[in-house]
Each structure stands twice: as C-alpha cells, then as structure tokens.
A protein has these predicted regions:
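Non-ligating segments of multi-cofactor redox enzymes
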Residues: 1-578
Length: 578
C-alpha cells in the first residue's frame, strides 16, 4: 500500500441555479488575457445539451481518454507513441476554434463617437482573432437553459446513445446544470499524451499542472483529455488548464469558483488513496465496474493501518486529520451519493457529482402528487426512465443501478428530514429502506443542506518543510511586497506584441507554479546594445532580451531599436512611429 493524498471536489447538482458566477469569477482571475479569450477553465452546461466544446463527449470523434487494447492493457484512445510521432506536426484529432467559438468584442467607439443622426448607431461584433466584422453564431453557453430547442439538444452525444430506447419529448423534458472544471484525474490522459512531459501531477496534493517551460505546443494534451479541459493559448503557443487555484489552496482557501458559488454546492477536501491500485482500477474489463473500482482505491483515514502508512509516506499529520473530516470522503465513500463524470474514460476523475433529484420531484409535483413523500419518490425513480438513464450515461457508464441508489438515498433524506423539521414522528423504516441509519441521514442532511464554510471546505495548508531556504525566503518576500497579478500580460494587463509575447518578467509563484517564462528568453530587460552574449529564442522574441540575428530598422537609431523589422520600438505603443 502506497498512500498518497489528493485534493478533490464534489458538486451537488440539485443546488446549481445556472447563474455562471463561478465561470465569470474564474475567467476574471485566470483567463482575462490575450490569447485565451475563448478559454473557460470553469463553465456551466445545460443538460441535455452539446456542452463546451461542442459534443466533447463523443470520444469516437475526439479520441480522448484511455481504452483497453486486445491484450487487456491500458492504452491511450488516440494512439501510442508511434502514432503520435507520425502525427506530431499535424494533430488530426483536435477541436478547432469553431468547436469552441470565435471570441468577439464590439466596436463601442461607433456608439460613443457617433454624431447626431436620424438612425441609431450600431456597435457591430468584431472578432478578437482577426479584428474583422463577424456574425455571432455560437458561444460557451449558447444552448443555455435549452435555449436552442430540440434542434440543438438532439446533438447531445449522451442523448444519442439513448435514441433507440427513449424519444425525447421536448415539451416534457427535464434539464439540470452541470458545472465543469478540470478533473485533476488520478490517471490523467493529458499527462500521458504530452510528448514533452510538460503536464505533471503534484505529489503533495494531486493537482495537475502545465510546466510552461517544457511545453512546446504539440497540443496532444488537448486530444488526450476526454473532458477537453486543456486549452491552447494561440498567442504564447502554450497549453493552459485549470490550476485548481493552487495558490489559494496552499494557504487553506477554496478555489475561486467554490468561494463565489451562489448555491454553495461545492465541497473540497482531502482524500487518501492507494497509488498501487490506480492502474488496476483503471484497467477493469467492464466499464460498469469502474465506479466500484475507483471507490476501492480510496482509503479510510480512520483506519490505524492507513494512518501509519500515511505517516511512513511523509504525509503530514494535519493532512490525515483533514482527510478524516473531509466532506468529499463522506459523500463518496460513507454516504455513497457522489458519482464521477464519465468513468468510462478510465482517467479516474477526482471531481465528483451528486446527481440531481429535482427532475423527479418536479415530475411528481407537476402531476399533483406529493413530491416529498418517500413512497412517491421511490416509485417515480423506478418509473421515470429518462432522468435515470440519462444520468447513468453521465456518471456510471450506463449502469442505472448506482444512480437509482443515489436518488433513493436523497429521496429518503428529503422525506425523513421533512418529518423531523415539522415536528412529526419520523419514519425509521425510511433510512432502513436505503441501507442507512438515522444518524447517517441526519449527518448527510447537515452536510448537504446547512453545512457552514469550514465544513464544506476542509483544506489543509501546504507545508514548507523540505523546500530550499532561499526559495522559501523569496516566496515570503514576494507574498509581502508584490501584487499577485502584477506581471506582463497578466489579468487586466495590455498585451504587447504578436504571437509569443510576454517573455519578460517572471510570473510570481504566488499566482502560478508553472515556472512560467522562467528562462523563456534568458532575459527580462529591454534590449541592451552593450550586451551581445545573451541568448534569445527567435521564434518567440518580442523585443525584450538581446536582438539576436534581427537587425534594427534602417530608420531607427541603435539605442531605440525595439524589435527588428515590424516590431514596435521601445516606448512606442503598437509599433506606431511618429
């Protein structure tokens, strides 16, 4: 047994109201920059729907995740090393910008500077990629709230699997919201797909990150990720992904999406797992056994043997104590109401979901029945095939059994706690019917309904033991004296050049530990004519560092040459000379 720790998240889908607050705050914190306008580390999808990017769940098309070969061994669905080598310069299986959407802005100057006229001026949408006028045809949440109608809904890859069994009646359909971030998998296909080894999983907390120094822009990770949560920055030529807000996590704060969530539906905590069982769990033959296999990988933090093994593995004591109080462990293994998203991808995802009971309750109340009665709820779960079957395709590789069990437990809690809150004698047979005790029902109700901040987010702080003293001192100095957003091309900063700019100052570690741009061009100063020995990456040069092989413009003096032909001179915005 090799014990490791993993920070994981559980989302209660019944509490998501689709307000997109998490998406907006994540966007402002992480991807409010040039080159990642189309990137949403966190997005909220309406189900049924196509998702973002469009039809990303269709792995027959996108070739994401893992599969078993003829010998029963785990292999990437997109192919092994030889296939990747043959297609390394032209990845044939990758979403285009049209599968995401072409980002745009508006020509607001048309409104602010328009003279008096008879007709109302119009601010036309302009592409952020080309700068030309464009027609808006899609976005990250174009089909929000089933806005596209049955024309768009019928393209849902999950719904297509059910087309032979169920015909979607749009007027009587159900819907729910599905917030998505990077799954930070135990067996990440994106890391295995990267030819440069730029994607890595941190040993101390399991967060999957991208080393910007090692990334060469092959984009195999985009194909390898079945959830399509790795994005390509077209200006820097690097891959970017959700970081699980690790600068906040390291000081015991939740992710920005969890912090700002209006519905308080997210739970974050530590899970201990046996690293030696990961490959075995991901390699089970039947897709429907993957849920059980992944749950078996997780270790009971109250087990003395697990505690001793964790201590021998160097896991701090406070992390073990946090695992004992973890809401994630309770929802996944104690109450067994949380399920992984698409376990059939075999990545062993670590962002789990509590399926929504609301479609069942709504169907009962719409027909005049008591939506809180245990008997009515149990019967509706068995008879309403559409919600259960659809949820099974999302969370249990098509097996409706675990979904029924989860919905039954949620229904039992709903009915039992109604009697308690109304002062009536609770029916003790309700918990027994779903294999739970009265204490389990009450504890689950507290966690799902009235848990406070410190109960929903049990996050131990990072430990500085073993760090290089000089590095630790610098990080403390940075924390006290620097702004975490004060770096070139950071959120809110103005970009300074074309593809490959922002090679100057290093990004503070308080914001990213990608070692981003550490020695991208071996210099962080403007051109110094007296220094002729500095190396420079000519493919990514932006006028900072030594000029290399580029000669200064004929009409520019040496001390004012900023970047060679076509590049802006120092101190002149956008390269416009007077």
């Amino acid at each position: 047994m090799r014990v490791m720790s993993q920070l994981a998240m559980v989302m209660n889908l019944d509490k998501c109201i689709g307000c997109h607050t998490c998406s907006v705050t994540c966007k402002q914190a992480w991807t409010n920059r040039s080159g990642v306008e189309y990137v949403w580390f966190n997005n909220v999808e309406t189900r049924p729907g196509q998702g973002y990017p469009r039809t990303y769940q269709d792995q027959e098309r996108w070739q994401g995740g893992w599969t078993l070969n003829r010998r029963g061994r785990l292999t990437l669905k997109a192919g092994g090393r030889l296939k990747k080598l043959l297609s390394i310069f032209s990845n044939p299986v990758m979403p285009s910008i049209y599968d995401y959407y072409e980002p745009w802005t508006y020509d607001y100057e048309t409104l602010t500077n328009a003279p008096a006229q008879q007709h109302t001026p119009v601010a036309r949408p302009k592409s952020l990629l080309t700068g030309r006028d464009m027609k808006v045809t899609w976005s990250a949440n174009w089909d929000d709230d089933l806005g596209g109608g049955p024309t768009l809904t019928q393209d849902d890859p999950v719904l297509k699997k059910l087309s032979e069994k169920i015909t979607l009646d749009f007027e009587q359909t159900f819907m729910f919201y599905l917030p998505r971030i990077c799954e930070h998998c135990l067996n990440p296909a994106c890391a295995a797909s990267c030819p440069s080894g730029a994607i890595y999983k941190r040993a101390e907390d399991g967060i999957v990150l991208v080393d910007q120094d090692r990334c060469r822009g092959w984009r195999m990770c985009v194909t390898g990720c079945p959830y399509k949560k790795v994005y390509f920055n077209h200006r820097t030529g690097k891959a970017e992904k959700c970081t699980f807000c690790f600068p906040r996590i390291e000081v015991g704060l939740p992710t920005i999406c969890a912090e700002t969530c209006v519905g308080r539906l997210r739970y974050i905590g530590v899970v201990l797992y046996d690293a030696d069982k990961v490959l075995e769990a991901a390699s089970v033959t039947d897709d429907k056994d993957l849920l059980r296999a992944q749950r078996a990988v997780f270790l009971d933090p109250d087990d003395p043997a697990v505690q001793r093994a964790a201590e021998e593995a160097g896991i701090p004591r406070d992390w073990v104590e946090s695992a004992q109080r973890s809401p994630v462990w309770a929802l996944i293994n104690r109450f067994e109401v949380a399920l992984p998203l698409h376990p059939e991808y075999r990545t062993l995802p670590m962002v789990w979901y509590i399926p929504p009971l609301s479609p069942v309750v709504d169907s009962l109340t719409d027909t005049g029945h008591d939506g809180e009665n245990a008997g009515n709820l149990f019967g509706a779960i068995d008879t309403l095939r559409i919600p259960v079957t659809y949820l099974a395709e999302l969370f249990t590789a098509g097996d409706p059994g675990p979904v029924r069990d989860v919905l039954a437990r949620l229904a039992a809690m709903r009915s039992f706690m109604r009697d308690v809150n109304l002062g009536r004698e609770p029916d003790v047979s309700i918990p027994d019917a779903v294999g739970m005790t009265t204490d389990d029902i009450e504890d689950m109700h507290r966690l799902l309904a009235i848990a406070k901040y410190d109960e929903r987010y049990v996050i131990p702080t990072a430990h500085a033991e073993g760090r290089d003293p000089q590095q630790l001192a610098h990080s403390l100095e940075e924390l006290a004296t620097e702004c975490s957003l004060d770096y070139e091309d950071g959120p809110g900063m103005t970009p300074s050049g074309p593809f490959g700019e922002s090679s100057g100052g290093a990004v503070p570690i308080a914001l990213e530990n990608f070692q981003m741009l550490k020695q991208r061009q071996r210099s962080d100063t403007f051109v110094d004519p007296s220094d002729g020995r500095e190396r420079v990456n000519l493919l990514n040069w932006d006028g900072k560092g030594q000029g290399g092989l580029f000669l200064p413009a004929p009409d520019a003096p040496d001390d004012d040459a900023g970047g060679g032909p076509g590049m802006p001179a120092r101190g002149e915005p956008d390269g416009i000379r007077p």
